Design a protein with these regions (language model features):
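A short, N-terminal "cap"/entry segment at the start of jelly-roll beta-barrel domains
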Residues: 10-60, 155
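Conserved short histidine dyad/triad with adjacent acidic residue
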Residues: 61-82
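Double-stranded beta-helix
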Residues: 23, 126-155
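Short acidic-glycine-tyrosine-enriched beta hairpin
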Residues: 101-122
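Short beta-strand His + acidic residue motifs that chelate non-heme Fe in jelly-roll/DSBH
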Residues: 71, 97-98, 118-120, 125-130, ...
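Glycine- and acidic-residue-biased ligand/ion/polar-headgroup-sensing regions
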Residues: 64, 83-98
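Short, positively charged low-complexity motifs
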Residues: 4, 8-10
């Protein structure tokens, strides 16, 4: 678990089609705790929303019919992963994600709806399911079992 106090503020990234809350970045001080791509976001081409040094990369892609992506392989590259970063894709329903600082203190919440995608990049987090929810979770492996996370009671 990371130590220190991380006050959280919500910053809204100003790209998209002018809609409200298109891509949101939740910060713990200067560290990104989460990136949310709202289901209303739309932009032609490829938009990487994560910094290049994140161990989990997330991009939004919108291509026209007939566009081709050149066949390719991904090469074996040794990487070091210090913290698990997970992506949740909300297929159905609504949930609230609560963000916590390094001292297990609640900081802020965000509501996710059908079609939203979130990358949980750092800090503590918990969820309350507001409607029946179906989601897909994607994270790095190999699975580390109980060593992967620390559960806590909010301060």
């Amino acid at each position: 678990m990371r130590t220190g106090s991380f006050p959280v503020c919500l910053r809204i990234t100003p790209y998209g089609n002018g809609g409200f809350h298109m891509i949101e970045k939740v910060y713990c001080m200067e560290e990104i705790a989460a990136i949310i791509i709202r289901h209303t976001f739309d932009k032609d081409g490829i938009e990487f929303v994560t910094p290049g040094d994140f161990s989990q990369q997330m991009a939004y892609m919108h291509h026209p019919k007939g566009h081709q992506i050149i066949p390719h392989f991904h090469n074996k590259v040794e990487r070091t992963v210090h913290f698990t970063q997970e992506i949740l894709m909300i297929k159905k329903g609504k949930l609230r994600v609560d963000f916590y600082d390094g001292k297990c203190r609640f900081q802020k919440s965000a509501v996710l709806e059908e079609g939203d995608v979130i990358l949980l990049a750092g800090g503590g987090h918990g969820f309350e399911i507001l409607e029946e929810t179906v989601m897909i979770e994607i994270k790095q492996g190999p699975y580390a079992g109980d060593a992967d996370k620390t559960r806590f009671e909010p301060a």
